[in-house]
Amino acid sequence: KVKKCKGRLANLVEKMDEEGKPQGHVGIGHTRWATHGEPSDINSHPHGNKRVTIVHNGIIENYKKLKDFLVGEGYSFASETDTEVAAKLLDYYYDGDPMKTIAKVLSEIKGSYALGIMFRDFPDEIFAVRKDSPLIVGVGEHENFIASDVPAIIHYTRDYYLLDQNEIAVIKKDSVKIYDVHGNEIHKELNTADWDVDAAEKGGYAHFMLKEIHEQPDSVK
């Protein structure tokens, strides 16, 4: 079940209080900064259809070309977003194997992005992948998370994996496995954030100015 609306997160909380919160134990969500398409309920995340649902941080540069291809294949689009294009492309290539589908889509899309993906056929799993946009996997006790940065999860866990380029994480309630695009499992070091909550918001730096200075090379890239 999808619940979304434009504006502040409080608007979504109010909407769910009025309509009833979805029942379940796996979910994805995203606070969207509008790049393709105006801020609106329909352009808000998640996007997808009955088989695939995604959230997306970043920009898909060749979304127009991919959208034209998908329209030619009979797909229609409700939003103006590049995210919906990625969702429909996943649906187009989906053959029952999420890993193969994600790898194929990664070979097609260009840009910098982080994706959180759910497949209807795999209701207990979240798939996550990144290219040039940050993405971490938080490891908790009988709960796991994906987020763009540590401050989003530090109230729930301090343990996390840093995903590298084109690595695919498969997240379940009690397990996290990470693979390359060829399906080979990767064993990564588990990191632990030893900062307090205030420091976490500064990324481990003493103050925000230092954080911004050290982030400038990545911003320029």
Which residues does each PLM region occupy?
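Conserved short alpha-helical segments that host acidic/polar catalytic motifs at enzyme active sites
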Residues: K1-K221
